[in-house]
């Protein structure tokens, strides 16, 4: 199973890239974890946000292909680390690749939300999208470590 984080936005601050890559490199070869960045639509005073969201959503879903779509969204289900570890095992047993979608400044398109088989909430707070990349990478690595009895996670 491959996990792909599909996120709107490019040119992240160096701390985001460093943090994400630190956890990305720790994933085992049998569970590759990759990042696909979708360029954000041009936003300005007269921007058509609905159209921008639609374009970003189409690009995200195209990048996912036939993978299981999981959105990262405030109304999603909050998981504890042990619950996320269970989800990781369920995703592996499903046999499909998993695509985790992080929207842009206005969130995810209605098409992305409709395509989602699951929705995961990291917090009831609105988090900066760059920070979400790092939090997701660390959370997934921690969940993996729990499933393999790796000493990274401690209760």
Swiss-Prot record:
<keyword id="KW-0949">S-adenosyl-L-methionine</keyword>
<keyword id="KW-0808">Transferase</keyword>
<dbReference type="GO" id="GO:0005737">
    <property type="term" value="C:cytoplasm"/>
</dbReference>
<keyword id="KW-0489">Methyltransferase</keyword>
<dbReference type="InterPro" id="IPR029026">
    <property type="entry name" value="tRNA_m1G_MTases_N"/>
</dbReference>
<keyword id="KW-0963">Cytoplasm</keyword>
<feature type="binding site">
    <location>
        <position position="72"/>
    </location>
    <ligand>
        <name>S-adenosyl-L-methionine</name>
    </ligand>
</feature>
<dbReference type="GO" id="GO:0070038">
    <property type="term" value="F:rRNA (pseudouridine-N3-)-methyltransferase activity"/>
</dbReference>
<comment type="function">
    <text>Specifically methylates the pseudouridine at position 1915 (m3Psi1915) in 23S rRNA.</text>
</comment>
<dbReference type="InterPro" id="IPR003742">
    <property type="entry name" value="RlmH-like"/>
</dbReference>
<keyword id="KW-0698">rRNA processing</keyword>
<comment type="similarity">
    <text>Belongs to the RNA methyltransferase RlmH family.</text>
</comment>
<comment type="subunit">
    <text>Homodimer.</text>
</comment>
<feature type="binding site">
    <location>
        <begin position="122"/>
        <end position="127"/>
    </location>
    <ligand>
        <name>S-adenosyl-L-methionine</name>
    </ligand>
</feature>
<feature type="binding site">
    <location>
        <position position="103"/>
    </location>
    <ligand>
        <name>S-adenosyl-L-methionine</name>
    </ligand>
</feature>
<dbReference type="Pfam" id="PF02590">
    <property type="entry name" value="SPOUT_MTase"/>
</dbReference>
<protein>
    <recommendedName>
        <fullName>Ribosomal RNA large subunit methyltransferase H</fullName>
        <ecNumber>2.1.1.177</ecNumber>
    </recommendedName>
</protein>
<dbReference type="InterPro" id="IPR029028">
    <property type="entry name" value="Alpha/beta_knot_MTases"/>
</dbReference>
């Amino acid at each position: 199973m491959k996990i792909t984080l599909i996120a709107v936005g490019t040119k992240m601050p160096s701390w985001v890239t460093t943090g994400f890559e630190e956890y990305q490199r720790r994933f085992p070869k049998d569970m590759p974890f990759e990042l696909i960045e979708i360029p954000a639509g041009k936003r300005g005073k007269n921007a058509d946000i609905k159209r921008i969201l639609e374009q970003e959503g189409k690009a995200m879903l195209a990048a996912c292909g036939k993978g299981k779509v999981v959105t990262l969204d405030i109304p999603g289900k909050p998981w504890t680390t042990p619950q996320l570890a269970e989800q990781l095992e369920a995703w592996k047993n499903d046999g499909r690749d998993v695509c985790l979608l992080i929207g842009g400044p206005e969130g995810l398109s209605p098409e992305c939300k409709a395509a989602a088989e699951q929705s995961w909430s990291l917090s009831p707070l609105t988090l900066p999208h760059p920070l979400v990349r790092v939090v997701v990478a660390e959370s997934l690595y921690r969940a993996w470590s729990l499933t393999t009895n790796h000493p990274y996670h401690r209760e």
